[in-house]
Amino acid sequence: MGKVIGIDLGTTNSCVAVMEGGEAVVIPNAEGARTTPSVVGFSKTGERLVGQVAKRQAVSNPDRTIQSIKRYMGTNHKVSIDGKDYSPQEISAMILSKLKADAEAYLGESVTQAVITVPAYFSDAQRQATKDAGKIAGLEVLRIINEPTAAALAYGLDKEGDQTIQVFDLGGGTFDVSILELGDGVFEVKSTSGNNRLGGDDFDQRIVDFLVAEFKKETGVDLSKDKMAMQRLKESAEKAKIELSGVLSTNVNLPFISVGADGPLHLDVNISRAKFDELTADLVEKTMGPTRQALADSGLETNEINKVLMVGGSTRIPAVQEAVRKFLGKEPHKGINPDECVALGAAIQAGVLAGEVKDVLLLDVTPLSLGIETLGGVFTKLIDRNTTIPTSKSQIFSTAADNQPSVEIHVLQGERQMAADNKTLGRFQLSGIPPAPRGVPQIEVKFDIDVNGIVSVSAKDMGTGTVQSISITGGTGGLSDDEINRMVNEAEKFAEEDKKRKEAVEVKNQADSLIYQAEKTIKDLGENADKAKVEAVQKAVEELRTAMNGNDTDLIKNKLEELTKPLHELTADLYQQQQAQQAAAQGGCAGGNCGGQAEKDNVVDADYEVKDDNK
């Protein structure tokens, strides 16, 4: 079994780690950074850019740059570039492919398996979408684990004794809070809650809105209509947010942000931490609802929580830390890196699956209740939230009308009382029910949740033994096997195109180098050069230059070879000329004509006498 990597596929940044020598280590990317921006860009020439290079060109190319795609996982959202629609799974797969390539470069071997983390509050559709993204990227996803649980693994692997911890995970686009009990290598999740639409992006947006309002008040110009200006504002807002975690005030200065009647307009606004706290107070308060819910579901009191782990870059915001401190009455634990601990935890779980890590048992839970729609549009729960997974549960139902020949099983996920208010996971029919009065047929509905939190449901007519089942494959926004296979093939095709593009660049670089060498050789030979050989080289150089103007890599390779032979002959002439010059120089010295030797021969010894003036 090859190396299994752990991936934190984040909203704004992603990270990859692996077990080495019994320890989880973060794998740096090709640019040398330990995290990779979850950004995908398409250049004007159609080249795909991922990570820091994509983020750098976002200001000048906002319409063709995709950020925070994780927020759309498990939905029908599509991104249209050059007339082609991309699903969130495909965009996420591009990010995963970059992380996979970086891991392969670091490890020096092929990587085909991974553990990928998701927010604890991700629905079944979002989990399935994440698994599909991995498949498109050429990865077998051995396990999907929850981000707070992964962070707890990273924190608690080397800890002794029993303790209860709360993981407060506020990332770029999602928020989770989980309570776990740790002891003797067992990591048991007691409860989890969260909000999949709350994260650092929302804090950034508050600053952007404030800057737009201030600029409009001062100049009358509405920057929200200018995509390029908005991208600059978004980048500056993120920097300001980060700076305000360490200082009490920061300045946002963006020259030439727009143009007015009298010429260029510049944005220059000071933002204090107090102002930032005021702008985002309701967002901080939104984190407290799930925090209270998780504590209530765990059946614990605040004084029974031993430690609070702060996970995700947004937990560096002072107001967030203060809210947690106030609620739990204790200082948040800052002994782990909030940007890397989730990937490290994923790598540890990967190590468990690969047999590298022993005596670790992870007991996670399902974040939302699961059930079916019953008579009157009621949501009947079969599996309650915070049930340890994997799990299986069945219940007997019956028909709602006399002689009903079939029933539709409407599978739902959520906490509301009515079916219409919950998330539909799928529907399927159980047919062939023999005629009978209502309430007589017995239909067993069985739910199974695997270790990844992915659901499958079956219905069985107890009278006839007829069984119908559905494996939930993403519900809304889910991909069929055919769609996934098509996307896998496209991803492989792109990888091949990328390889060809890289080869074309390398061949052109070789050609440039050889042309430079040819011209330098001709110059060094000067008047002593064999004219026929020079003409042959010059002709080959011109043909190579012409080939380089096109995109036919094979033609350039051929012309490279055609230049190499006459150039070798010319280089041999240059070498012989240099050898002759060196021999002539040495011969001159041997004849006594070297300057140093002549001077030595002309030295005359002089007699001298010392006079003593005191005599």
Curated annotation (Swiss-Prot):
Residue segments, region Disordered: 581-615
Induction, as annotated: By stress conditions e.g. heat shock.
GO MF annotation terms: ATP binding; ATP-dependent protein folding chaperone; unfolded protein binding
One Pfam entry name: HSP70
NCBIfam families reported in the protein's UniProt record: PRK00290.1, prok_dnaK
Superkingdom assignment: Bacteria
Gene3D superfamilies hit by this protein: 1.20.1270.10, 3.30.30.30, 3.30.420.40, Actin, Chain A, domain 4, Substrate Binding Domain Of DNAk, Chain A, domain 1
Keywords, sorted A to Z: ATP-binding, Chaperone, Nucleotide-binding, Phosphoprotein, Stress response
Its job: Acts as a chaperone.
Protein name: Chaperone protein DnaK
InterPro entries for this protein: ATPase_NBD (IPR043129), Chaperone_DnaK (IPR012725), Heat_shock_70_CS (IPR018181), HSP70_C_sf (IPR029048), HSP70_peptide-bd_sf (IPR029047), Hsp_70_fam (IPR013126)
PROSITE patterns: HSP70_1 (PS00297), HSP70_2 (PS00329), HSP70_3 (PS01036)
Modified residues (Phosphothreonine): 174
UniProt family annotation: Belongs to the heat shock protein 70 family.
Compositionally biased spans, kind Basic and acidic residues: 598-615
Keyword Zinc part of the UniProt annotation: no
